[in-house]
């Protein structure tokens, strides 16, 4: 991880109360997970699929095998999308994951809206994210009633970013982060900065208050856990140490890192040392 990325995830850890875990990671092949767990929590982007409908080798067959063997599946994603829309997009890629099995970081916006009595906000993100604000009763405005900015992606230009900075420099400002991820993997193996890092920069530049939804924070995991049978053996499978693995550890479930996507082999040991976390299991993919 690059330095700014590490600092962001350390900031998240501080917000959650600074805890750590250091189990000995076991390198296994994906099929070995079948016998170990009853419930599978999956990250979405970078774990099962990537941009343009690209599906990682073996991912569809792995999900299908889970269905055939009666395993429970949940999608725990920081993609702040409507669950029905995301389910339909997944089906187009060959994944049968029902809307009620999807737990998105965007699900928690309504609670923050009520907590802070938000009626309107300035929005940074793609068009598909606007439905979450509408569903939560938030009007999208250039001059919101209160200095509130909601960010869920980095698909905006420099003019919109400057306007967000202006709003967040006002007294009593609040930045709501619907996707806390720092970086996302590309198909070619490179990585791109995403909304978590942009939000972190805004916070440091404007000294605004910040609320984050989604992984690694425990609420999204806890809500998903309530939907599965008690005493189930649960594993979180994802590609990101600072969100998927840390979040799983926070709520006491096992974790499995998909190596080589958002986590490079060459930096793995150092990154684990910095954050104080290692996954229970490591796989190189689903084949």
How would you name each of these model-derived features?
Residues 1-53, 57-60, 64-74, 87-100, ...:
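Asp-based, Mg2+/Mn2+-dependent phosphohydrolase catalytic module
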Residues 106:
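Class I S-adenosyl-L-methionine
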Residues 79-83:
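Canonical radical SAM enzyme core domain
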